[in-house]
């Protein structure tokens, strides 16, 4: 006959309870070992008795590593999913805030353009009027400053052009003076007469006068005395003896 079904309830007899605990504990540890060997599974078993005594089995090298792995698998997913939900809720709140701000800006823009003024009360209309006046002052101030900047730029450009014009005028005057002097010099050479030019050239180049008489020990008185008879002889047709 087979063994009857055991009712699962606390064993009241203390001795029987201890005996059953020891048998079932050993059987559970054996089953855990067999499971880890047969199926190549990482198995960790922790048992505390009623007196607080610890019984454990771990198929890996360290029970702590198995517990850390268990903690990552069990609580890590919860911790990851929790921030994602919080981030989603925070993003949705931020979206609602931005949407409300965008709608408010759209209403303000329409009011500044003179649209949808019906729902506004007197205080809101006065505030809108002050905003428009302030905006108009800023626009006018910006426009005035822009025009002043443009005027300053134009004045600087005008000054540069004036200086350039003065420089060009001085250069043209110098060129005109040079051309006038050159034309005056050329016209003066062309109008000068040929005789005057020849006289000038002769003034520069004076030929030397040669006397065929060799005047060694020259005496002016003697020469004059000799020249008179010689002239007379020449007239009579006689040749002087010193010339033979």
UniProtKB/Swiss-Prot annotation:
Alphabetical keyword list: DNA-binding, Flowering, Nucleus, Transcription, Transcription regulation
Annotated GO CC locations: nucleus
Protein's UniProt keywords contain DNA-binding: yes
GO BP terms: flower development; positive regulation of transcription by RNA polymerase II; regulation of transcription by RNA polymerase II
Compartmental location: Nucleus
Keyword hit for NAD: no
InterPro entries associated with the record: MADS-box/MEF2_TF, MEF2-like_N, TF_Kbox, TF_MADSbox, TF_MADSbox_sf
Domain MADS-box, residue spans: 1-61
Domain K-box: 88-178
Coiled coil regions in record: none
MF-aspect GO terms: DNA-binding transcription factor activity, RNA polymerase II-specific; protein dimerization activity; RNA polymerase II cis-regulatory region sequence-specific DNA binding
Tissue spec: Expressed in flowers and seeds.
CDD domains registered for this protein in UniProt: MADS_MEF2_like (cd00265)
SMART domains: MADS
PANTHER family: SERUM RESPONSE FACTOR HOMOLOG
Protein name: Agamous-like MADS-box protein MADS2
Species whose genome carries this gene: Vitis vinifera
């Amino acid at each position: 006959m087979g063994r009857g079904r055991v009712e699962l309830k606390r064993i009241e007899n203390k001795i029987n309870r201890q005996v059953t605990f020891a048998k079932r504990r050993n059987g559970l540890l054996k089953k855990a070992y067999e499971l880890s060997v047969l199926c190549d599974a990482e198995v960790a078993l922790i048992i505390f008795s009623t007196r607080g005594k610890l019984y454990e089995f771990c198929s890996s090298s360290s029970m702590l590593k198995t517990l850390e792995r268990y903690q990552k698998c069990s609580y890590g997913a919860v911790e990851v999913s929790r921030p994602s939900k919080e981030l989603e809720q925070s993003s949705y709140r931020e979206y609602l805030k931005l949407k409300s701000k965008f709608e408010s800006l759209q209403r303000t823009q329409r009011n500044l353009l003179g649209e949808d003024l019906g729902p506004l009360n007197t205080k809101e209309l006065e505030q809108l009027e002050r905003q428009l006046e302030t905006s108009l002052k800023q626009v006018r101030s910006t426009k005035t400053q822009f025009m002043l900047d443009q005027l300053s730029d134009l004045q600087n450009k005008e000054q540069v052009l004036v200086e350039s014009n003065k420089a060009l005028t001085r250069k043209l005057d110098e060129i005109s003076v040079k051309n006038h002097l050159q034309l005056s010099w050329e016209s003066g050479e062309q109008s000068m007469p040929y005789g005057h030019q020849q006289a000038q050239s002769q003034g520069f180049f004076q030929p030397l006068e040669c006397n065929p008489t060799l005047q060694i020990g020259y005496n002016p008185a003697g020469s004059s005395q000799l020249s008179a008879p010689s002239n007379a002889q020449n007239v009579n047709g006689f040749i002087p003896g010193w010339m033979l």
